[in-house]
Amino acid sequence: MAAAVAVAAASRRQSCYLCDLPRMPWAMIWDFTEPVCRGCVNYEGADRVEFVIETARQLKRAHGCFPEGRSPPGAAASAAAKPPPLSAKDILLQQQQQLGHGGPEAAPRAPQALERYPLAAAAERPPRLGSDFGSSRPAASLAQPPTPQPPPVNGILVPNGFSKLEEPPELNRQSPNPRRGHAVPPTLVPLMNGSATPLPTALGLGGRAAASLAAVSGTAAASLGSAQPTDLGAHKRPASVSSSAAVEHEQREAAAKEKQPPPPAHRGPADSLSTAAGAAELSAEGAGKSRGSGEQDWVNRPKTVRDTLLALHQHGHSGPFESKFKKEPALTAGRLLGFEANGANGSKAVARTARKRKPSPEPEGEVGPPKINGEAQPWLSTSTEGLKIPMTPTSSFVSPPPPTASPHSNRTTPPEAAQNGQSPMAALILVADNAGGSHASKDANQVHSTTRRNSNSPPSPSSMNQRRLGPREVGGQGAGNTGGLEPVHPASLPDSSLATSAPLCCTLCHERLEDTHFVQCPSVPSHKFCFPCSRQSIKQQGASGEVYCPSGEKCPLVGSNVPWAFMQGEIATILAGDVKVKKERDS
């Protein structure tokens, strides 16, 4: 009995045309040209299911997916009208005939067997029925006899109709992507060195290439090659656009451009060369380089890398080298970007290094780097540890801080710069942060910390864990008062510098404190209390009234004589430890 029920259930199931799985009748949709299940319709989208069905129909015909005695679902009524399965070569000939480009000189639209959504092809021609195949075969064979060539897939001849394994799967789709050579219009695809011979018929362009290809003259090809990135040959698709010889020639030209000597720059006397003149020369030489291979370097980069390089370049060096870097010619020659103020010997070598390392995309009229709040933000990349050290624009520093110093001695230094050779993105974020502040030059060596809180607000339990700097954020206070800059007021620091030099201890019981679990007085940085002492102090002062600092003093708020007091929520949080323990024991 159970076997009979199973047979009846299996007989009621309908096979989906796309996923070829047996489905129950309530899971099938009959609104399209073939019966498809609801899962396929939801996955593909109701507006694209017809295109997918047409693609699947062509694939099944081309590859002979149906064994003997089995026909595609729903094809019993039209089985007599459909011819036997066709090969991919026949489909190519039929498409040539239908598009009206049956001549041997025209480049046909290649049947991309692995493309999933033939949007352009399906939108330009009506769906082909079985009778179309039968009527078009003799004409196609007369117009162009079949050749034993394998079918072109994405413009590359492969023996079995499948694309190469090393190509990413997005090359098999018709959606535009940067690897399809979209920078060159389809009607202006040349053999990149100006060859006037058209592409052979077998090399059909895989994407949405037009049927007619115009050969471009040598000047047009050269202008296209210099203005657009030649990433067509770099992504293993040389057969569809250019020959291997053309690619080699392009590489030789690019190498020649990089090796040619720089244009001679006008130099005045060494004693009259000022900082602005040196900056103008550096900017002009960088702009001249960017018109060569620099543009291609910038264009070939991803968008985020281009934005980062642009932002970092705009904050370039505009001041003279300091004494430390003058004493170390190894740093000056190859690793640092900039120039010397006397301009006698080191300027050309360093400017050439800067031109190779940092192509400038800004317009030529711009002289020197833009300034933030009247001060330039130079970044000196030291390529040893990836640490970015800003040259301090004030003349009071004899030398910039060494790489071993904390990166927080200057506000213009990224706070994450000393960690693992931080990427330029963090530096870029901090540059944007400094650009938004109106007092970046005043507190140039104030500790830049996201944990700084408003001193007028009473402490809260949510911010209790944020009232002390991390170990890496405190070391900069030692270098804070150097060079005659404005010293940091101690009250603006959320913690004392004892956090790294000595272990944290409770002010009352002198027991060691946990890293993130203690009570910090917002007025006196040295007042730190463990939770048991804080609870005892709150109970002694009376939790119902005003509860002041657990040290017994009425520590005033910064900038006023009013002593701070705990909020009721903070008192409840501190006292909640005992209650929670009792509840856990009771349960």
From Swiss-Prot:
What InterPro entries does the record tag this protein with?
A: I2BP1/2_C3HC4-RING_sf, Interferon_reg_fac2-bd1_2_Znf
| Numbered residues of crosslink Glycyl lysine isopeptide (Lys-Gly) (interchain with G-Cter in SUMO2) | 289, 303, 324, 326, 348
- Signal sequence coordinates: none
Q: Where does each RING-type zinc finger lie?
A: 506-553
Q: Note down the stretches annotated as region Disordered.
A: 126-192, 225-306, 342-420, 437-494
Listed name of the protein: Interferon regulatory factor 2-binding protein 2
Q: What is the effect of changing residue 551 to N?
A: In CVID14; increased protein abundance in patient-derived B lymphocytes; impairs immature B cell differentiation
**What keywords tag this UniProt record?**
Acetylation, Activator, Cytoplasm, Disease variant, Isopeptide bond, Metal-binding, Nucleus, Phosphoprotein, Repressor, Transcription, Transcription regulation, Ubl conjugation, Zinc, Zinc-finger
Where do the record's region annotations for Cys-rich lie?
Answer: 506-550
PTM note: Phosphorylation at Ser-360 is required for nuclear targeting.
Q: Kindly list the positions at which Phosphoserine occurs in this protein.
A: 71, 175, 240, 318, 360, 406, 423, 455, 457, 460
Specify residue ranges for compositional bias: Low complexity: 272-287
Q: Which disease is it linked to?
A: Immunodeficiency, common variable, 14: A primary immunodeficiency resulting in recurrent sinopulmonary infections since early childhood, and characterized by hypogammaglobulinemia with undetectable IgG and IgA, poor response to vaccination, and decreased levels of switched memory B cells. CVID14 inheritance is autosomal dominant.
- On this chain, the residues bearing N-acetylalanine are 2
Spell out the subcellular localization from the entry.
Cytoplasm; Nucleus
Which CDD domains does this one have? vRING-HC_IRF2BP2 (cd16716)
Protein function: Acts as a transcriptional corepressor in a IRF2-dependent manner; this repression is not mediated by histone deacetylase activities. Represses the NFAT1-dependent transactivation of NFAT-responsive promoters. Acts as a coactivator of VEGFA expression in cardiac and skeletal muscles. Plays a role in immature B-cell differentiation.
Q: Where is the composition biased (Basic and acidic residues)?
A: 247-260, 292-306
Q: Which organism is it from?
A: Homo sapiens
Annotated domain remarks: The C-terminal RING-type zinc finger domain is sufficient for interaction with IRF2.
Give the family from UniProt.
Belongs to the IRF2BP family.
Question: Gly residues: which segments have biased composition?
Answer: 473-483
Question: SUPFAM superfamilies recorded for this chain?
Answer: RING/U-box
Which GO terms label this protein's molecular function in UniProt?
A: transcription corepressor activity; zinc ion binding
